[in-house]
């Protein structure tokens, strides 16, 4: 199961894995895949067609425009991996 907070929007054909956590105001566009154990923080946006890898963390307010590798952390606009 996944945990979605208040104000989350999940688009058409989105696939959400097990144990995913989404903070308030997260927007997941259509045709997105979120891997198991991912965490997406407040106000983040994941654009259409993106895959968020298993165990990844998306920082608050990030705009994810490309795939996120498993077990990585991305932040910013556009979202980039932390070094």
PLM features: what roles do these ranges have?
Residues 2-75, 79-82:
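Structural signal for interior beta-strand "rungs" in well-ordered beta-sheet cores
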């Amino acid at each position: 199961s996944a945990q979605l907070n208040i104000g989350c929007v999940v688009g058409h054909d989105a696939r959400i894995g097990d144990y995913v956590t989404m903070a308030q105001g997260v927007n997941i566009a259509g045709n997105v895949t979120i891997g198991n154990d991912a965490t997406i923080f407040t106000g983040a946006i994941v654009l259409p067609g993106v895959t968020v890898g298993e165990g990844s963390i998306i920082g608050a307010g990030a705009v994810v425009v490309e795939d996120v590798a498993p077990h990585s952390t991305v932040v910013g606009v556009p979202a980039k991996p932390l070094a």
